[in-house]
Swiss-Prot record:
<dbReference type="GO" id="GO:0006412">
    <property type="term" value="P:translation"/>
</dbReference>
<keyword id="KW-0694">RNA-binding</keyword>
<dbReference type="GO" id="GO:0003735">
    <property type="term" value="F:structural constituent of ribosome"/>
</dbReference>
<keyword id="KW-0699">rRNA-binding</keyword>
<dbReference type="InterPro" id="IPR002363">
    <property type="entry name" value="Ribosomal_uL10_CS_bac"/>
</dbReference>
<dbReference type="InterPro" id="IPR022973">
    <property type="entry name" value="Ribosomal_uL10_bac"/>
</dbReference>
<comment type="similarity">
    <text>Belongs to the universal ribosomal protein uL10 family.</text>
</comment>
<keyword id="KW-0689">Ribosomal protein</keyword>
<protein>
    <recommendedName>
        <fullName>Large ribosomal subunit protein uL10</fullName>
    </recommendedName>
</protein>
<dbReference type="InterPro" id="IPR001790">
    <property type="entry name" value="Ribosomal_uL10"/>
</dbReference>
<comment type="subunit">
    <text>Part of the ribosomal stalk of the 50S ribosomal subunit. The N-terminus interacts with L11 and the large rRNA to form the base of the stalk. The C-terminus forms an elongated spine to which L12 dimers bind in a sequential fashion forming a multimeric L10(L12)X complex.</text>
</comment>
<comment type="function">
    <text>Forms part of the ribosomal stalk, playing a central role in the interaction of the ribosome with GTP-bound translation factors.</text>
</comment>
<dbReference type="InterPro" id="IPR043141">
    <property type="entry name" value="Ribosomal_uL10-like_sf"/>
</dbReference>
<dbReference type="GO" id="GO:0015934">
    <property type="term" value="C:large ribosomal subunit"/>
</dbReference>
<dbReference type="GO" id="GO:0070180">
    <property type="term" value="F:large ribosomal subunit rRNA binding"/>
</dbReference>
<dbReference type="Pfam" id="PF00466">
    <property type="entry name" value="Ribosomal_L10"/>
</dbReference>
<keyword id="KW-0687">Ribonucleoprotein</keyword>
Length: 172
């Protein structure tokens, strides 16, 4: 990479840090190419991204962002997992770490809050924004459905009574 490419990459990475809801930093030493591709595809499907960057460039890109406090995590072979949804990157990273012992989560950030390894794991156990939205819609629509059933019930009962009288008249 020449200087211009490095500047462009740092600018791009800085924007990614600013736009992301959460960032997870992990060591990936010993992972095979297929394992890395698997991680990238899982993260991409979930709406996040994985990037391997030189530590020095990542530290420069962190300057001026809310995530600046995690600069100390960038030692050794590190990668960055990030997503706009604060839950996605931690969830995918923790799930991947469970099946790959060479993938070690170092920590991360959510906005201006630095996250320890345990905090990243706790964050991963929470439902995502889409799951929360679905639950909220379900909670809101359920009472409306029940009200509609209660309002329509008397009309249905009247119709059944009239139908029963009609049956009796035909039988007699």
């Amino acid at each position: 990479m020449n200087r211009a490419e490095k500047r462009e990459f740092v600018t791009w990475l800085n924007e990614a840090f600013q736009k992301s809801g959460s960032v997870v930093v992990a060591h990936y030493s010993g992972l095979t190419v297929s394992q890395m591709n698997d991680l990238r595809s899982k993260m991409g499907e979930a709406g996040g991204a994985v990037k391997v960057a030189k530590n020095r460039l990542a530290k420069i890109a962190l300057q001026g962002t809310e995530s600046e406090s995690i600069a100390g995590l960038f030692t050794g072979q590190t990668l960055i997992a990030y997503s706009e949804d604060p839950i996605t990157a931690p969830k995918v990273a923790v799930d991947f770490a469970k099946s790959n012992d060479k993938f070690v989560i170092l920590g991360g950030s959510m906005g201006a809050t630095s996250l320890t390894v345990d905090a990243v794991k706790s964050l991963a156990s929470l439902p995502s924004l889409n799951e929360l939205r679905a639950k909220l819609v379900g909670m809101i629509s359920t009472p409306a459905t029940r009200i509609a059933q209660v309002v329509n019930a008397p009309a249905g009962q009247v119709a059944r009574v009239i139908g029963a009288y009609a049956q009796e008249d035909k039988a007699a």
